[in-house]
Amino acid sequence: NYDKLGKPVNRDEWEIYPQTYNAYYNPSNNEIVLPAGIFTVPGYRDEELDDAVVYGYGGASTIGHEITHGFDDEGRQFDEKGNLVSWWTKNDEAAFTKRADVMVQQFNEFEPVKGYHINGKASLGENIADLGGILLGIEAFKKTQQFKDNKNISNLTPMQRYFMGYA
């Protein structure tokens, strides 16, 4: 929007409407935007939801995913104020690059359609955010009573229901 050019950034302004079914991490504001619409779990009524599904969906695929974007191949380049600054130590950068390269190679091997491979480098940020989201969501879910009780619902274990929610 050209009328904003040269003016101070309004850090309270969202780029999407509250009812939007999406979430995002904005590195230049160092913020995660989670509109109300994103908390509707597709295919479920609220009374049908259990912690496993909610943590798999909301914790992993949404909140954890967006948090992890702050530390992926792009988000890590911004400091806590949203400035484009190198703030990691050389050792941290080297360790990150080593692990990221493994993920790039792993995704390069995926062939979802015969003859077509995923570009692991191009999808790195999303792949890191997906993995980080899953791991953060699991850590949060492990603190719930449902996880501790470990009782099946509809013949599915709590962890199976967690991944059903993620899917």
Give the positions of each predicted feature:
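Intrinsically disordered, low-complexity linker/terminal regions across diverse proteins
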Residues: 1-61, 66, 70-167
